[in-house]
Structures are given as structure tokens and as C-alpha cells.
């Protein structure tokens, strides 16, 4: 991916492209002159700070989805808990869904505050080996809308990356907003500048309306050189809690995520069932693995965690 400066216009072709400083989208950009002469913008002074923070994080995983409402944040929170079931591993969640942060509610820490010190922001502790950072902790009222343009969102994401004092972390899961917007471009750019990115998990539901956007997300990863660890199909079926009968909830007119993965040469890591008890646990900020340890879904999350760990060895 050609580099796109943080302060570039929306139509920036990238500093490494043939049209740098000359394309119509470059008009009025503060970097236009330097790009046109081949000099490019000055080095980003924050990159070394991000590199320093992330040098203590072993594995960094993006959680992506093309469409909202497919369960991306649900997957993030429960995969984090599954990974943290090993007390020897330190796990963290970074919630960069700036306009729709839901992790604090799901993790039962909605009323907590972030403390700032000379070492930076201290993420909120969920359990001894699991922490969380979200813009929701910085809002005066949890019902306040975040009405920001792209540049301000990107600035917030950069601040998360350079100012949060994570400490030593084995797995950092990054919960992103749906789509392939400014936030995704800036986030990937910053992360790749900071060092290797392990890859992305892409979340979908079985119906073609969801898969249409998943294919765009796959294209985004290819173009930005983000490795794809695999695809997770959420709400693949409903398992009756009384008789264990399985019912397909959504039509799979094109074969669902399984066929899409075959067509795209991707691995389908899990097909997670829909379980009402999970929605209740998330609304109440409870640990689903404690409230429903024997459920099919809890076991599916634990199996997924093992597959993810195997890919990161």
C-alpha cells in the first residue's frame, strides 16, 4: 500500500504513487509540494513512540467485518476471554470503534475510568490478565454521540497507539468499526510502521448480503498487505437449549462463508451458533464462560482460540 499521510486529503493517491502531488485529489493538501518533487511528507514523529509501545506486544490481531451487526465486537470480547482463560497469558482489547464503542458494556466495566500518568493511559482491568482501552472511558456521558470527522478520529486512534501503557502483552485484539473507512486505513498504516502485524480475523454471517461486504474486506486486506488469519461465520445456526436440535436461521443462497472461503482460498476457522444466553451475558457485562461453561458456543470460542494460537506460533 502506498503511504497516505495522516493529514492528507481524502483522495490521496499515496506518496509512493506516480500521481503523488499531481492528482486532482492532491489540490490543497499540505503535502502537495513535497510529494510532487518526490520528497514526500516529513517523517511522522509519533511512529517511534508507537514502535516503542508495540515492541512489548507479541501478537496483534485485527477483528474486521464488512458490515455492522454481524457480531464483530461479540467475537472480540469472547475470543479475548477465551485466550485469557490461560492465566499465563496477558490479553488486551483495543476498541477503535470510535462512534460505536461497546466493549466496556460487554466486559462489565462501563463505569470505569482511565487513569493518566507519566507512563501514559492505563487500560482498564477486567481480570488480572485481561485489559481494555476504549473511547467510551473518555466520554463525560456514556450516551454522548461522537460526532467527529475522519481527521479527528485518526488522531484519536494514533493517540491510543502511542499513549496507552499496555505493558507486556501476549495477544492484543483490535476491535474495528465495520467497513473500510479512514479509520482502517490509518490504523493499518500506523500498525505496519510499528512492526509486523499478525493478521486479521474477518467476521461474517451466512447470508449473501453480509458476504458481499466481506469480499470487500478481503480485498482491503490484500491491498493493504494485511495477512488474513481466517474467517469466522457467526450466527451460523441456532441450537435449541432444550433438545439440542439445530436450525439454520439465515439463507445461504451462495453457500455461505464456507463457499466464499473455498472461492477465496481462505480458511473458515469457526461457524459459531446463535445462543440467546450470550446476549444476556453481554448486556449484563458477565463472563459467558462462567455463566454457561458447558454451552456449545462457549466450547466453540475455546476451540477458535486454540486455532488462532496455532496460527501465531
Curated annotation (Swiss-Prot):
A cellular component term, taken from the record's GO annotations: cytosol
CDD domains: Mrp_NBP35
SMART domains cross-referenced by the UniProt entry: AAA
Sequence positions that bind [4Fe-4S] cluster 2: 240, 243
Presence of keyword Hydrolase: no
Tissue: Expressed in head amphid and labial ciliated sensory neurons and tail phasmid ciliated chemosensory neurons.
Residue numbers binding ATP: 66-73
Cofactor names: [4Fe-4S] cluster
Pfam families named in the record: ParA (PF10609)
Biological processes per GO annotation: cell projection organization; iron-sulfur cluster assembly; regulation of non-motile cilium assembly
GO MF term (any one): iron-sulfur cluster binding
SUPFAM superfamilies on file: P-loop containing nucleoside triphosphate hydrolases (SSF52540)
Family per similarity comment: Belongs to the Mrp/NBP35 ATP-binding proteins family. NUBP1/NBP35 subfamily.
HAMAP family linked to this entry: Mrp_NBP35, NUBP1
Role noted for this protein: Component of the cytosolic iron-sulfur (Fe/S) protein assembly (CIA) machinery. Required for maturation of extramitochondrial Fe-S proteins. The NUBP1-NUBP2 heterotetramer forms a Fe-S scaffold complex, mediating the de novo assembly of an Fe-S cluster and its transfer to target apoproteins. Regulates cilium formation and structure.
Subunit structure: Heterotetramer of 2 NUBP1 and 2 NUBP2 chains.
Protein name, UniProt field: Cytosolic Fe-S cluster assembly factor NUBP1 homolog
Annotated source species: Caenorhabditis elegans
Gene name as annotated: nubp-1
Amino acid at each position: 500500500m502506498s503511504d497516505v499521510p495522516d493529514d492528507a486529503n481524502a483522495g490521496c493517491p499515496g506518496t509512493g504513487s506516480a500521481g503523488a502531488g499531481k492528482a486532482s485529489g492532491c489540490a490543497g493538501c499540505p503535502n502537495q509540494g513535497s510529494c510532487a518533487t518526490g520528497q514526500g511528507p516529513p517523517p511522522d514523529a509519533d511512529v517511534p513512540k508507537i514502535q516503542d509501545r508495540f515492541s512489548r506486544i507479541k501478537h496483534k490481531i485485527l477483528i474486521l467485518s464488512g458490515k455492522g451487526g454481524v457480531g464483530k465486537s461479540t467475537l472480540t470480547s469472547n475470543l479475548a476471554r477465551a485466550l485469557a482463560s490461560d492465566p499465563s497469558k496477558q490479553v488486551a482489547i483495543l476498541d477503535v470503534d470510535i462512534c460505536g464503542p461497546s466493549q466496556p458494556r460487554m466486559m462489565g466495566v462501563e463505569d470505569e475510568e482511565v487513569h493518566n500518568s507519566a507512563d501514559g493511559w492505563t487500560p482498564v482491568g477486567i481480570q488480572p490478565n485481561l485489559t481494555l482501552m476504549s473511547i467510551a472511558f473518555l466520554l463525560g456521558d456514556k450516551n454522548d454521540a461522537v460526532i467527529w470527522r475522519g481527521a479527528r478520529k485518526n488522531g484519536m486512534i494514533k493517540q491510543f497507539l502511542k499513549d496507552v501503557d499496555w505493558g507486556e502483552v501476549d495477544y492484543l485484539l483490535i476491535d474495528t468499526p465495520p467497513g473500510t473507512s479512514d479509520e482502517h486505513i490509518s490504523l493499518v498504516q500506523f500498525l505496519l510502521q510499528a512492526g509486523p502485524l499478525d493478521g486479521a480475523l474477518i467476521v461474517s454471517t451466512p447470508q449473501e448480503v453480509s458476504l458481499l461486504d466481506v469480499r470487500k474486506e478481503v480485498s482491503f486486506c490484500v491491498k493493504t498487505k494485511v495477512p488474513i488469519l481466517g474467517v469466522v461465520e457467526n450466527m451460523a445456526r441456532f441450537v435449541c437449549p432444550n433438545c439440542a436440535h439445530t436450525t439454520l436461521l439465515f439463507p445461504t443462497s451462495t453457500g455461505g462463508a464456507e463457499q466464499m472461503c473455498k472461492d477465496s482460498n481462505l480458511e473458515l476457522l469457526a461457524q459459531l451458533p446463535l445462543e440467546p444466553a450470550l446476549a444476556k451475558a453481554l448486556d449484563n457485562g458477565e463472563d459467558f464462560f462462567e455463566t454457561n461453561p458447558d454451552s456449545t458456543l462457549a466450547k466453540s470460542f475455546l476451540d477458535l482460540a486454540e486455532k488462532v494460537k496455532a496460527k501465531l506460533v
